[in-house]
Amino acid sequence: MGVQYKLAVGLGKGHKVTKNEYKPRPSRRKGALSKHTRFVRDLIREVCGFAPFERRAMELLKVSKDKRALKFIKKRLGTHLRGKRKRDELSNVLVAQRKAAAHKEKTEHK
């Protein structure tokens, strides 16, 4: 709404009021990771590595077969959205691996 004027008609009629600020409901937090959860998942990933379907999907991503990787992951996980999320996660892992390899190579040459 616009600026409040002292008019009896129109959108700006009535008293000037401030909106109440409510605390967000707990359901709004769904999907947000806590520090502990993120730590535990990272630890498990470090210890267990990747599942066989994730390794195959990463191989497909390495040779730029993104659509094929998505179809493959979608078949394994069940939904399109989960497939897209997993594909993005695995492509981020590949980028991180490339960065780590480049950094390691750079430090060895010095």
From Swiss-Prot:
<dbReference type="InterPro" id="IPR038097">
    <property type="entry name" value="Ribosomal_eL36_sf"/>
</dbReference>
<feature type="region of interest" description="Disordered">
    <location>
        <begin position="13"/>
        <end position="34"/>
    </location>
</feature>
<dbReference type="Pfam" id="PF01158">
    <property type="entry name" value="Ribosomal_L36e"/>
</dbReference>
<dbReference type="GO" id="GO:0003735">
    <property type="term" value="F:structural constituent of ribosome"/>
</dbReference>
<comment type="subunit">
    <text>Component of the large ribosomal subunit.</text>
</comment>
<feature type="compositionally biased region" description="Basic residues">
    <location>
        <begin position="25"/>
        <end position="34"/>
    </location>
</feature>
<keyword id="KW-0963">Cytoplasm</keyword>
<dbReference type="GO" id="GO:0002181">
    <property type="term" value="P:cytoplasmic translation"/>
</dbReference>
<keyword id="KW-0687">Ribonucleoprotein</keyword>
<keyword id="KW-0689">Ribosomal protein</keyword>
<protein>
    <recommendedName>
        <fullName>Large ribosomal subunit protein eL36</fullName>
    </recommendedName>
</protein>
<comment type="function">
    <text>Component of the large ribosomal subunit.</text>
</comment>
<comment type="similarity">
    <text>Belongs to the eukaryotic ribosomal protein eL36 family.</text>
</comment>
<dbReference type="InterPro" id="IPR000509">
    <property type="entry name" value="Ribosomal_eL36"/>
</dbReference>
<dbReference type="GO" id="GO:0022625">
    <property type="term" value="C:cytosolic large ribosomal subunit"/>
</dbReference>
